[in-house]
Amino acid sequence: MSKPLIVITGASSGFGAEIAKLFNADGFPMLLLGRRTDKIKALPLDFTNVLVESVDVTDKTSFENAITKAEEKYGKTDLLVNNAGVMLLGNVLNQDPAEWKQMMDTNVLGVLNGMQIVLPQMVERQGGTVINMSSLAGKKTFTNHAAYVASKFGVHGLSETIREEVSGKNVRISLVAPGAAETELLTHVTDESALNDYNLWKESMGGTTLAPERVAQTVKFIYDMPQTVNIREIDIAATNQ
């Protein structure tokens, strides 16, 4: 029996790349989305049943077109991993409001776009899973993270609300909230002071953060549960955080 389609956003690096490796190793057809398709195509994957599309999740039309293209080839999406995200550190007193908007658009509206695209068919066939990547910053505050924290609290709130709305149709909505991890999220930070504060905080924990592979294993664990079991949320962090 052929395996169903897995869609992963933000698949070029970090959590998304590691999630793609796990599902690829298990033989799932995949749609991998990201703005840096060259990096996705350079991943150590068997691309026989993998589509790679350049998509900005804030552009709902291109997002939907990519999913439609994949579903025409592999069937309906059974798992959407909303992994694309932006973290731009800064103090609200002086951070560029354009950075607030970028985080809200990607981290919140991008997630909603993906869910609105795939949920109608999941509800109709009474099956399917959406796993939203949030953060421990969706549960507690961190200095110089005000807008990012707001966006991730939003992901927590929308995930639980939509879970309540679709759970009666046997559709699972789950959430993974990682702590500090070794990804490329910090490469776009423009506030050097905020970045230095973050690095000092990381050093205070011994400099050890979460490996993206562990987050990928968590996503796979959630998905591999029977459809009648929904692990609503997993918070995961390095032991010393």
Where do the PLM segments sit?
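Active-site helix of classical SDR
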Residues: M115, S151
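Substrate-binding pocket helix/loop in short-chain dehydrogenase/reductase
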Residues: N91-V92, E99-K101
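Residue(s) in the substrate-gating loop at a strand-loop-helix junction
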Residues: S135
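Conserved glycine-rich cofactor-binding loop
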Residues: S12-S13
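The beta1-alpha1 cofactor-binding region of Rossmann-like NAD(H)/NADP(H)-dependent oxidoreductases
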Residues: S54-N65, P97
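C-terminal helical subdomain
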Residues: L175-V176, L195-Q241
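Conserved glycine-rich Rossmann-like NAD(P)H-binding loop of the short-chain dehydrogenase/reductase
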Residues: D26-K41
